[in-house]
Amino acid sequence: MFSHITVLKEESVNGLAVKPGGVYVDCTLGGGGHSERILTALAGEGHLYAFDQDEAALSFAAEKLSRFKENITFIRSNFRHIKEELRMRGVDKVDGILFDLGVSSPQLDEASRGFSYHQDAPLDMRMDQSASLTAREVVNTWPFAKLHSIISRYGEEKFSKQIARKIEAYRLKQPIETTGELVDIIKEAIPAPARRAGGHPAKRTFQAIRIAVNDELGAFEDALTDGFELLNEGGRMAVITFHSLEDRLCKQMFKEKTKLPDLPKGLPIIPADQKAPFALITKKPIVANDEEIKANNRARSAKLRIIEKEKQTD
């Protein structure tokens, strides 16, 4: 069964300042929790466009949100195609965009999807089941240097070199087929004292491979870039991240958008007349409270950042 606990639901949707009659985008439909809250705030007016790559998520959400069917359009696509998908539907501008970058709980928990290091399953990790690249291909065919690079960069794993070497040595004997095999290889590569410290020893490597399989950071950067352009003046973007790589990218891109525009030297401009194209609504990220973390431990690492497109004076 598809079930998913929505993280920072009230904070993120309230942060969008949804107005009845507006046009909004939920880039990560998942279980439909955020979409349901946005549609409720729209009060039967306006429209929501909801993206997801996962057919199971779309089917579940379509049934869950059936009472809002006149006000929602479901789009099966990676959110990196937000601009093209909306333009195909005659939409050039929107009033708010939401990203929840957590992998949805059903994907993590369903063994057959190959995301979980707690359950043995074929190596897959594709968000979009129609995509060609799988975790099996990454683990068995990517050269040592590339494996080392992604495990280090995307997993921020201290033992990335040792893990990549161990994978390389193992696959010379036979292909690595399952998540269980990969977990055992990772455990062998990490020194015993380090294995006993912190979380699961395979967590960072699995994260790295998942990000690589789905090009998550590249897709996120593309979607943010197009999202800024799509927003109406006064429109807002809310982003929930779950690990430092996503949060760093979001923070950096938000910072760039809130800088004053570059002006030619010597131009007689009064500083007060200069205006950045965007303004930060959250000076520091909003995090889950103790009550939410107690109910859903995955909320512990969630960070919410919100930005607004400024109204430009002529």
From Swiss-Prot:
Protein name: Ribosomal RNA small subunit methyltransferase H
SUPFAM superfamilies per the UniProt record, alphabetical: Putative methyltransferase TM0872, insert domain (SSF81799), S-adenosyl-L-methionine-dependent methyltransferases (SSF53335)
Subcellular location as annotated: Cytoplasm
Catalytic activity: cytidine(1402) in 16S rRNA + S-adenosyl-L-methionine = N(4)-methylcytidine(1402) in 16S rRNA + S-adenosyl-L-homocysteine + H(+)
One Pfam family named in its UniProt record: Methyltransf_5
Record PANTHER family: 12S RRNA N4-METHYLCYTIDINE METHYLTRANSFERASE, S-ADENOSYL-METHYLTRANSFERASE MRAW
Enzyme kind, highest EC tier: transferase
Binding site for S-adenosyl-L-methionine: 32-34, 52, 79, 100, 107
Family under the similarity heading: Belongs to the methyltransferase superfamily. RsmH family.
Organism: Shouchella clausii (strain KSM-K16)
InterPro entries: RsmH, SAM-dep_MeTrfase_MraW_recog, SAM-dependent_MTases_sf
Cited function: Specifically methylates the N4 position of cytidine in position 1402 (C1402) of 16S rRNA.
Predominant localisation class: cytoplasm
Name of the encoding gene: rsmH
